[in-house]
Amino acid sequence: MLRRVHPAPHERVTVAEAYTVERVPHEHRPWVGLCMVTSLDGTVAVGGASGGLGNPNDLQVLLTLRSITDVIVVGAGTVRGEGYGPPKKPGQRIGVVTNRGSVDLDDELFTSGAGFLIAPADADVDDDRVEVLRAGREVVDLRVAIERLHEIVPAVRYVQAEGGPTLNAALLEADLIDELDLTVASRLSGGAGPRLTRGADEIDRRFDLAHLLVDDDGFVFGRWTRRR
């Protein structure tokens, strides 16, 4: 259970109650949420992975959001660093964003048929071994890719992005983030770890606070939606 700080009334709620709210897709593309965890000083990975930052409630948030997601979109580096495998939700697909096609197609994520690639038109990828959604040249055009996800999952309504920071920055620049589900861990990490968006131009995107929750470990769980 978590304690709701915003909106009133201030009461205990379950993760499912807080996060399984309706998301309405856009006319020409699905709703895109970004789910991340960060330290108090902004690091999103410790030792190359985000798992060391979270706690059981943060994991429950991630799993709850995945349970209502049609497609997970994640960068190739995050897939390698976090050890992504096939999703637990039947029929769910995982789109791996790569500009160069440098992924291991023998990984179970792809051999299971759950994983597919999102790559530029000129990326060196064996289309006979893996399903590929091509958008852009040299670098992925994420807006085009998100708008064409229905070619992979016809009924797609909700997409969850899970990093890493380079993908987050590209989504930010393309103004594709409709929702930010951000856990702030009650710890400082120091070091030179990556921040939430790496390499993005300076941008002012405004969001509205949908809820703010806290747990007994001092973790803060926020959900913001894009002000449009």
Model-derived features: where do they sit?
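Enzymes that bind and transform nitrogen-containing heteroaromatic metabolites
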Residues: 1-228
